[in-house]
Design a protein with these regions (language model features):
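Short, flexible N-terminal segments of the mature chain
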Residues: 14-42
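Acidic, low-complexity intrinsically disordered segments
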Residues: 34-86
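Short, extreme N-terminal segment that most often corresponds to the first beta-strand
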Residues: 1-21
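Generic structural motif
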Residues: 11, 23-25, 84-86
Length: 86
């Protein structure tokens, strides 16, 4: 089961948030799709995903995307994605 919590943070406060969930088993091959789906729900740009992001998610069950991880200009300090299905 996949359940992810997406939080857009600005000045250490949650500005927007959403959760996505799927009944399928979590796979890192689909990690980009999960991120895209959550960003679409938040009406936010989708970040570039590098190996560092996947490794942090695997190790700590959450990942932070900073404005430098986005191609487009974003108006927030970070996008946090947390795994709720541990």
């Amino acid at each position: 089961m996949v359940k992810l919590w997406f939080k857009i943070m600005h000045d250490n406060k949650i500005v927007k948030q959403t959760t996505i969930s799927h009944d399928e088993k979590f796979t890192y091959a689909d990690f980009g799709e999960y991120i895209s789906e959550g960003c679409y729900a938040l009406d936010a740009a989708t970040p570039l995903i590098i190996r560092h992001h996947i490794m942090n998610f695997a190790k700590y069950n959450h990942v932070n995307f900073l404005p430098s991880d986005f191609v487009e200009h974003v108006e927030f300090d970070k996008l946090v994605v947390e795994n709720l299905d541990r």
